[in-house]
Each structure stands twice: as structure tokens, then as C-alpha cells.
Amino acid sequence: MLRHWQLKCSEKALRKYRKKQKHFFCQATPGAGKTVLAATVASKLLEEDLVDLVLCFSPSLTVSDGIKKTFSKTLSCTFNGGLGSVGQSLTYQSIQFLSDDFWKALRNYRVFVVFDEIHHCSGSEIENANVWGQQVLTKVQELATYTLAMSGTPWRSDSLPIVMAEYNTPDGQLLVDYQYTLKQAIADNVCRSPKLVLVDNEHLSVTSDEKVESFSSILEMLKQTKTSYRSVIHNQEAMEYLLDLGCKKLADIRHHSPNAGGLVVASSVYHAQTIKKILCEKYSQTVSIVTYRHEEPLDEIERYRRDNTQWIVSVGMISEGTDIPRLQVCCHMSSVKTELYFRQVLGRILRVNDSMFQQAWLFTFAEQNLIKFAERIEQDIPESCMFAKMISQVDLEPYTQRNKLSEKNFLEELEHSYANLIWSNTTANNCNPNGQLSEFDELRLGTFKQRVISAFLA
């Protein structure tokens, strides 16, 4: 059965196509079910004999495989481009490798083309397009009878226009045919309401060239020294602290939903392997790992989706479009700090399932960009961003008494610090895994605090 928004959006798209209007753009929050929407529209177009074939393009093999499965189920046929199939799911990268015969053959058919996460393709014309955008503009755009472009995060970090998107003038705001926001999705119980925990530290010290500097926050340290954010996310004790929070929260959720899982987004393969070791050896967790260096990552993701393993550690393999509804906890330790990536990662824990306990928790460090992104996850709702007292390291429920919140105009900070905690850089000889000297001799993190941002409070 379709969700209400999927029904309304599909009806609107079909009305537009029936009027011979070629293009439809849908912006729907990550985790809302855009693939099911696209498959439904494709099914209706085939049923009404408005198209003969369906092509889907997406940014990764993981997403492409998910699309293939959803379309096969919805259309009740194979969706691999072979005999008896009505279409195929491909990656944007594969477009440039398809033969001329492939494109010539398609010209004999009416083709419905679905562009998933279209923001990966930039350019309003060939001159300002990226490689994927050029392929869409030169090989796909004119071929398609109808197109459906979809994105949960319809903007680009480089501020270039998205392929086939329309913008108003003069402010350049994206024009969409249908929009389904996170606020709407949470109200409809389509997505979980997220809680974001920003871990900061009040007594940091950086020792470099026999000079000791002290700072009251991660933000202050990063601004006033050459220490990089990577130094924080690669610090052994810092990793252990964030993972400890994640493990305790996952354990709490699994008391109610035994199949709940956690995702750790790492910055490199070495980082992911270190994180896996910590989770296994220090916290006795069961862990899967998927990176471009590991064999059969798609199979590993599928195994994790179906089994009861507690954690999956990923480097770029599980971000946008990856459908694992049992994920309810995320530890964000990636060095990528763009709002696009942040929201896509958050989207991995927002998909609802049949569990009665639909919490979603993201843990990360209080870095400047991440603070900003977290604060505006849902900035239009009053009292949506608050400081929350952490009752203990085990119980991470935010302090949310409505009569208390109503007394504050914007933010209320309720701090609870844990003293006598020192995170030291334990890497031998102050070298990183690549053998290069660190930017500092020692990083110590003492008293720390946690800030919780609870979005979409009722």
C-alpha cells in the first residue's frame, strides 16, 4: 500500500505526463520512500501504454541494486535489461560506457527515465556540467519520453545548478513539482524524529613544540591551532567515547527492538578497521564492515540488512539511498563535513520499520559545520533546537519538559560534565598511519559535555 505522499505525488506526476509535459522533479526527504514512488509511476505509465521501457540511474551500485529489487517487485518482472525485462537500473558512471548501439536501439522506444539523487549531476549546459551531468545532457535528455528526477537533498556543495532542474530568478531558488519535507514525514510517521548528540570538551590541551595550549571547546581548538578535525576523529580515546555512547544507546533500543542496528561512518579504510577493532574488542559487539577495499560489499550490506549483527562500519558505502530500516543509531566520524553528506547520513537512521520503538540517534563531535547543520535540520519549528542535560552516560534521553522549554526563547543549556576523563593521543612516535608526523605532540581532552538537538518536538 502506498503512503499518502507517494499517492499524491504519483497522481500529480501522471497528470503532468498526460498533458505531454516531459519533466517532473520530486524533492522528498531521505528515507521517505522515493524508489517506491518511482516504481509506482513507472507501473502506471506502462499500464496506460504511455511508455515501452524504463531506465533508472543512480549514483552507486548499492542504490542501483536496491532500485532493481524494488522495480522488479512492483512491476512483477525482472529489471535487469535482459529478455522479458521492461527496463534496467544503472549507475550514472555507467552511462559513458554504454555502446552507441544501446542508445540507437532505445530511440525506437518510448522511454521513461528515472534520475535518483539527481543532485550528483551538475550543469545547465555542457560548458558548466560535471562528467555525469554531461552524459545526462548529451545522451539521455533528448532520448527520454518522460523523466522523473528525485532528490532528498537538492543542492550541491559547489553551488552549481543541478542537471534538468529549473530555478527561479533572481534568487536562484530550485523549483520543484512536489516537495515532501522531513517535518511532514515525521508527522505522517513515515520517518523517525531524530535526536542529534554533539559531543564537546571543556578542557582540551594541545602540546606542540614543547608549548601547551588549553581550550574550552573543540571549536576553539580547531580555530586557533593547526590541529585538524581528523586529529579528533582519529584519537583513540575520542573514538572510544563516542562509540561508548552509541553502544549504550543501541543496547537500550535493542531491549525494545532486538533487531535494531547501528551505523558508524568512518573517514578511511584504516579508520574503519580501527573502529571495528574497538567495537569488537572493547565493547564485545558484532560488526560488519564495508569499504571499497573489501570484497563483495553489496553482499555484505545485504547480509547485514537481513541478519542481527549490531553494527556496520562504512566508508562511503552506506549514505544516500541505502535502505536498511533497522538502523536506528549512527556514529558520524567522517572527515566529510558538508551539509549534503550530513543529511544523507542522517537519513540512514530515519526510515521506519515495523518496530514499536522508533527512535533515531546520531552521535558526532561539536565541530563548527556539524553544529550548524544539526541546528538547522528543522530550524522552522519553535523550540526544536535545545541543549539537553545528559542524565548519565547510559541514559541519553533529553530533558524535555514542555513547561521548562516554554520559558526559553531559543536555546536552553543544561550541562552535565564528566570530570577526570583524559583522552590522549596514543599513536607511537606521534606518527599517523601513513608515517607522517602529527601536527601536534599530544592532544588531551578532559572534561566534556554532550548537547542534544531534538528536532520536531510535538
Predicted regions and their residues:
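Interdomain helical connector at the RecA1-RecA2 junction of SF1/SF2 helicase-like NTPases
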Residues: 159-258
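SF2 helicase catalytic motif II
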Residues: 104-148
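Long, largely alpha-helical accessory region at the distal end of helicase-like NTP-driven motors
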Residues: 233-234, 238-241, 249, 369-458
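Conserved helicase ATPase motor motifs in RecA-like P-loop NTPase domains
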Residues: 29-31, 119-121, 138-163, 189
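Inter-Walker segment of RecA-like/P-loop motor cores
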Residues: 68-106
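Conserved Walker A/P-loop ATP-binding site and its immediately adjacent core
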Residues: 35-45, 50-72, 267-270
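Conserved RecA-like P-loop NTPase helicase motor core
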Residues: 286-390
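Walker A/P-loop
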Residues: 19-41
